[in-house]
């Protein structure tokens, strides 16, 4: 039993932040505050479904966050490591003894002329909602271009095509670069069945985006009423702005215990941190493991013990290709893909099970945290009446 109460602030309420907060809140003597710019939890692995209306991709924090976790709806603007204080956009500050840096990731500026001005993103709630509105204002027969053939691009292209849209997928090189060559085949067959035009090859690169089209590296110009950019992610620049060391993608640099190389009181969880010698793929699968691991690092330090290196286990990647079919790409525990897969309707079922399992894991964590203490005031929200809060944490 700890003699003094320890204050832990979790910055970011995604998969990593929520799992870390719930784990910490189970421990007596630890008070947890979660700072997040939105009053709801965003189920990011369902954002492509929000675009077509098959899911709203949002859960109330009351469902996934322990009742003894204090929720502050605001945007963190700076971390003062020396004073152990987080400044908020609403004008206040939150002090901490330990901090979990879990700001997640979002779309990056690809540096392609016109992309920022005219393309849409599916990497956050606001972007997905804007895309949905743009599609609603566009005739169903109008051409739609999806740029990037990673998981987000594949799922978005298939979802739109199944909804009756005329979709072109510009791969940037190869279809499904994170997939095994054998697993790309059922993906290609499914996209062809849905009527998606797939452009592959070294010159299948978008070099310019306009209001009504895209230009490729080989000179081709494609009409596009709605262009969706899914290639590349970057984390918010909060760590860099706070004077903490980051990598080229803006991720907080940590050691093998997820601890910032600049301050042992700051621990990263999810997409926002990186161990340079052991980088993990930015993913929900990684985040739900890194959140509890970050919490354990802090709890061990509080108890006067040495923090242990993080251990990860990966099972594969689940992709939905519309509502009726999908592909599950299996991997070795180190996240290296192999040739094993499940496709078709069974693949779609596995994806749906994975999504529900992830949500159930968060709900279970919230219940365990809530069982430790009585419920108090949960929500402090200078922006709680405004759903469209600033992007990024």
Report each predicted region and the residues it spans.
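Beta1-alpha1 glycine-rich phosphate/pyrophosphate-binding loop at the start
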Residues: 2-70, 155-181, 392-393
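Conserved N-terminal Rossmann-fold NAD(P)-binding element of oxidoreductases
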Residues: 11-12, 101, 147-148
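A Rossmann-like FAD-binding core segment of flavoenzymes
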Residues: 70-79, 86, 94, 163-256
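Rossmann-like dinucleotide-binding core of oxidoreductases
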Residues: 143-189, 193, 197-199, 282-296, ...
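A conserved FAD-binding loop/helix module that cradles the flavin
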Residues: 240, 248, 272-322
């Amino acid at each position: 039993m700890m003699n003094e109460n320890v204050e832990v602030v979790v910055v970011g309420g995604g998969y990593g932040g929520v799992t870390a907060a719930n784990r910490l809140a189970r421990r007596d003597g630890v008070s947890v505050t979660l700072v997040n710019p939105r009053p709801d939890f965003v189920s990011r692995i369902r954002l492509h479904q929000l675009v077509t209306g098959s899911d709203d991709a949002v859960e109330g924090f009351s469902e996934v966050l322990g009742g003894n976790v204090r929720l502050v709806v605001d945007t963190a603007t700076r971390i003062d490591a020396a004073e152990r204080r987080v400044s908020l956009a609403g004008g206040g500050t939150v002090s901490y003894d330990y901090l979990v840096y879990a700001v997640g990731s979002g779309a990056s500026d690809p540096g392609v002329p016109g992309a920022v001005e005219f393309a849409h993103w599916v990497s956050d709630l606001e972007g997905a909602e804007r895309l949905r509105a743009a599609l609603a204002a566009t005739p169903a027969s109008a051409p739609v271009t999806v740029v990037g053939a990673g998981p987000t691009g594949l799922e978005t292209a298939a979802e739109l095509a199944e909804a009756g849209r005329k979709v072109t997928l510009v791969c940037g090189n190869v279809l499904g670069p994170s997939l095994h060559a054998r697993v790309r085949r059922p993906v290609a067959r499914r996209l062809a069945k849905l009527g998606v035009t797939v452009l592959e090859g070294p010159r299948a690169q978008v070099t310019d985006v306009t209001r009504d089209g895209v230009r490729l590296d080989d000179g081709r110009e494609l009409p596009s009423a709605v262009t969706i950019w899914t290639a590349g992610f970057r984390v918010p620049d909060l760590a860099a702005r706070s004077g903490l060391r980051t990598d080229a993608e803006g991720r907080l640099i940590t050691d093998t215990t997820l601890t910032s190389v600049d301050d042992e009181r700051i621990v990263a969880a999810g997409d926002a941190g990186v161990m340079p010698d052991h980088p993990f793929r930015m993913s929900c699968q990684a985040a739900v493991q890194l959140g509890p691991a970050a919490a354990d690092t802090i709890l061990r330090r509080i108890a006067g013990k040495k923090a242990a290196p993080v251990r990860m286990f990966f099972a594969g990647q689940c992709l939905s290709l519309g509502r009726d079919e999908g592909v599950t790409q299996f991997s070795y525990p180190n996240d290296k893909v192999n040739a094993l897969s499940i496709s078709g309707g069974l693949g779609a079922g596995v994806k749906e099970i994975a999504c529900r399992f992830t949500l159930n894991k968060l709900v279970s964590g919230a219940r365990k945290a809530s069982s430790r203490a009585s419920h108090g005031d949960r929500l402090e929200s200078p922006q709680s009446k405004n759903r469209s809060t600033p992007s990024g944490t």
